[in-house]
Amino acid sequence: MRKHPQSATKHLFVSGGVASSLGKGLTASSLGQLLTARGLHVTMQKLDPYLNVDPGTMNPFQHGEVFVTEDGAETDLDVGHYERFLDRDLSGSANVTTGQVYSTVIAKERRGEYLGDTVQVIPHITDEIKQRIMAMAQPDGGDNRPDVVITEIGGTVGDIESQPFLEAARQVRHDLGRENVFFLHVSLVPHLAPSGELKTKPTQHSVAALRSIGITPDALILRCDRDVPESLKNKIALMCDVDIDGVISTPDAPSIYDIPKVLHREELDAFVVRRLNLPFRDVDWTEWDDLLRRVHEPHGTVRIALVGKYVDFSDAYLSVSEALHAGGFKHYAKVEVVWVASDDCETATGAAAVLADVHGVLIPGGFGIRGIEGKIGAIRYARARGLPVLGLCLGLQCIVIEATRSVGLVQANSAEFEPATPDPVISTMADQKEIVAGEADFGGTMRLGAYPAVLQPASIVAQAYGTTQVSERHRHRYEVNNAYRDWIAESGLRISGTSPDGYLVEFVEYPANMHPFVVGTQAHPELKSRPTRPHPLFVAFVGAAIDYKSAELLPVEIPAVPEISEHLPNSSNQHRDGVERSFPAPAARG
């Protein structure tokens, strides 16, 4: 009789059926948090069945945000959920796509590694997928082998694209043994309003489709807008051949951070550790209960305007939104994110209309010229009103453009938006010029991942971080043009952080005597924020917004600001001295 290999690491697969967007990622993340709170070492992985190598070149409206890991991988937004709930950094291996798998297999075929074989989906593609799944069980940098690997399989059961991944997962159970592998299936139990009934047939059919490919789920997550009664849970357990203890009702929760409590109430974590024979302790709720108190018992509310291009699809700014909320948790404050389309801020009147009742303005990252003048207009409005501003990546670049325009460089722009501008205060990075020119691959070639920065002592950012040595994740091709540092200084904007060699501008800010809080960073600090450990920049920004709200500023009348385009000089030699510097003095908090 064949014996299965001894496996110190257990594997748990999360699949989905009936419909997409049921919350597989949040379910997997919440279970990971529960197992971690039981003292287990957990890591996570997402299998994405699209042919792109990574999501880096996808439209944010289609895919949502691109989450960048410490090692510079562009990954699915669910990896961000994993990091936030587990409170640990993951690597690029946490996201596997069909594009990656096929690229590797085809490259091996070209090198002759399959010499003599007909390369097929089974076994070559599935073997490559299995290899990437099993690699997650290897010890990490601290030589700690995970107790559990949770692997989320993207898509829904029945999709053609997902079949190789489901087959690979089935083979992992065959290779490691049923005692070492757990299948969790997330399914929809719809409520039909006309009849007032909950219907179980979609879940039954979804499980039947899963069983037809050789996978019998150990537990079912029933997604519904209300609790599923015991009678229906018993029916589903019978018809789907699942232990009744593994039929888990998960009604919609008030907050995503309540989901671990919902799963624990249904005893899913206890069922998993028993089934996989894992050592465990009781759940330590100390940290999570403190978080939930801050989530549900805020002492006040602040309104933060997120001025972006993709605000019609909030997942495009998921990590930014979560970092803002986490910054609020630190202050026992609820952050209400006001989604503002950047196009609405292109004129002073438009900016005043949409930003009149907010307490802070956040300018997120992005690409392309659409909406840029609106982001700059929002910064101009916030500067004059004394509104706190935080600029991320492109947001820093917009702060620099607005600052240099205010001291006479009215054609100041980015080489990304206006290659022929006479004053490219934002320029293409030297190692990106061939890529921008179309002479090299576009995907996966930006300045990606964690890079160090040195902060100026006593600066706002140094005070926020509590140190002058920091590391942040990046994703950009453009940088502040060092030839314009004197013009930046003339505007009052201070370069408060650079790369260790002093070359690349990483942080800018206005001194407190000019404005209470305008900070820009070339990085994406939102990617390192955790609900239980908010990022210090977001803590400082939300704190400044709370101060702004508390100050009860008197109205400040802003002089009419002419549209820049109406006053562009005819010659590039005229723009520095031919425009009156009439930018209104920034307001100070009273």
UniProtKB/Swiss-Prot annotation:
Record key words, sorted: ATP-binding, Glutamine amidotransferase, Ligase, Magnesium, Metal-binding, Nucleotide-binding, Pyrimidine biosynthesis
Binding site for UTP: 20, 199-204, 235
Chemical reaction(s) catalysed: UTP + L-glutamine + ATP + H2O = CTP + L-glutamate + ADP + phosphate + 2 H(+); L-glutamine + H2O = L-glutamate + NH4(+); UTP + NH4(+) + ATP = CTP + ADP + phosphate + 2 H(+)
Record-listed ATP binding positions: 21-26, 78
Binding positions (CTP): 20, 159-161, 199-204, 235
InterPro entries according to UniProt: Class_I_gatase-like, CTP_synthase, CTP_synthase_N, GATASE, GATase1_CTP_Synthase, P-loop_NTPase
UniProt note on regulation of activity: Allosterically activated by GTP, when glutamine is the substrate; GTP has no effect on the reaction when ammonia is the substrate. The allosteric effector GTP functions by stabilizing the protein conformation that binds the tetrahedral intermediate(s) formed during glutamine hydrolysis. Inhibited by the product CTP, via allosteric rather than competitive inhibition.
UniProt record, GO biological process: 'de novo' CTP biosynthetic process; pyrimidine nucleobase biosynthetic process
Region (Amidoligase domain): 1-278
Pathway, per record: Pyrimidine metabolism; CTP biosynthesis via de novo pathway; CTP from UDP: step 2/2
One family name in Pfam for this protein: GATase
Cellular compartments per GO CC: cytosol
Domain Glutamine amidotransferase type-1: residue ranges: 303-551
E.C. designation(s): 6.3.4.2
Residues that, per the record, bind L-glutamine: 366, 394-397, 416, 477
Chain spans, region Disordered: 566-590
MF-aspect GO terms: ATP binding; CTP synthase activity; glutaminase activity; identical protein binding; metal ion binding
Residues annotated for Mg(2+) binding in this entry: 78, 152
Active site, UniProt feature: 393, 524, 526
Enzyme class at the top of the EC tree: ligase
Complex and partners: Homotetramer.
Other remarks in the entry: CTPSs have evolved a hybrid strategy for distinguishing between UTP and CTP. The overlapping regions of the product feedback inhibitory and substrate sites recognize a common feature in both compounds, the triphosphate moiety. To differentiate isosteric substrate and product pyrimidine rings, an additional pocket far from the expected kinase/ligase catalytic site, specifically recognizes the cytosine and ribose portions of the product inhibitor.
Its biological purpose: Catalyzes the ATP-dependent amination of UTP to CTP with either L-glutamine or ammonia as the source of nitrogen. Regulates intracellular CTP levels through interactions with the four ribonucleotide triphosphates.
Protein name: CTP synthase
